[in-house]
C-alpha cells in the first residue's frame, strides 16, 4: 500500500540515486511508480523533425522510480521513515511511525 502523496518530501532508499532527496511530483501506473523532482534523470537523444519544428540534440528528462525505492523523509530525525494512519478529531491523518509526529500539518 502506497502511503505517499503529491508534494511529500522523499528520500531514495535503493538504486543509482540512493540517499538523494526530492519532492513527489506525480504518480504513474496506479501509484506503483513515482515521479520525484531531480531524481532518475536520463539523457534522451532526439532526432530532428523539420515538419514539426523539432531540432536534434540531447535532452535531460526525469523518469519515474518504483514506489518501493523511495521512503518519506522525516525532518525531525533526518532519516527515512514509515507512515501510519490514525484518527485525530474524527479525521484520518498520517503520522511518522518512529516518533509519532503528524505528517500532514
Curated annotation (Swiss-Prot):
Sorted alphabetically, which Pfam families does this protein's record hold? KOW (PF00467), ribosomal_L24 (PF17136)
Record keywords? Ribonucleoprotein, Ribosomal protein, RNA-binding, rRNA-binding
According to the lineage, what is the superkingdom? Answer: Bacteria
Any keyword Transferase?
no
Asked if the Swiss-Prot or TrEMBL record annotates the protein with the keyword Cell cycle, the reply is: no
GO cellular component terms, semicolon-separated: ribonucleoprotein complex; ribosome
Per the UniProt record, which residue ranges are transmembrane? none
Q: Subunit info? A: Part of the 50S ribosomal subunit.
- Family listed: Belongs to the universal ribosomal protein uL24 family.
Q: What is this protein called?
A: Large ribosomal subunit protein uL24
Amino acid at each position: 500500500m502506497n502511503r505517499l502523496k503529491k508534494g511529500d518530501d522523499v528520500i531514495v532508499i535503493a538504486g543509482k540515486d540512493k540517499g538523494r532527496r526530492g519532492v513527489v511530483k506525480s504518480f504513474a501506473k496506479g501509484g506503483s511508480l513515482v515521479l520525484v523532482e531531480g531524481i532518475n534523470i536520463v539523457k534522451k537523444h532526439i532526432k530532428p523533425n523539420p515538419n514539426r519544428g523539432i531540432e536534434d540534440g540531447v535532452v535531460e528528462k526525469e523518469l519515474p522510480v518504483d514506489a518501493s525505492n523511495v521512503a518519506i523523509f522525516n525532518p525531525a530525525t533526518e532519516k527515512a521513515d514509515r507512515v501510519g494512519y490514525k484518527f485525530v478529531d474524527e479525521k484520518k491523518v498520517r503520522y511518522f511511525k518512529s516518533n509519532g509526529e503528524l505528517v500532514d500539518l
